[in-house]
Amino acid sequence: MAAAAGNTLIIHPWNPTNKLIKEDDVMKIFDTMGIASKISIQDLSRYQKAFVHSSYVEATANQALSNHKKVLFSACPSDCLPFQDESYENLEFLGDRVIELCVVWYLYLRFPM
């Protein structure tokens, strides 16, 4: 949602339903997969980062604004999640590399030259 204040466009991107995932939520996901008893959450912030889309990152939001003149974000309400520092993309990249390594290792062992 956006509003005009004089020559400045003020954007209201805040959504009170955006929340960081909680440990209970993570464990429910693991429970549906039948692995909750085998998992111990050591660092909840990693799981929370895994659910942050790149469009909800501070740098991305500010970059989008820099393409326009006189555009501002409204203040983040106390019941809303502020923009985050990082998205899940770095974790996704690392996960992709782990899967790639596993597949390549399997193929190497399965089909030796």
Language-model region placement:
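Double-stranded RNA-binding/processing signature
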Residues: 1-113
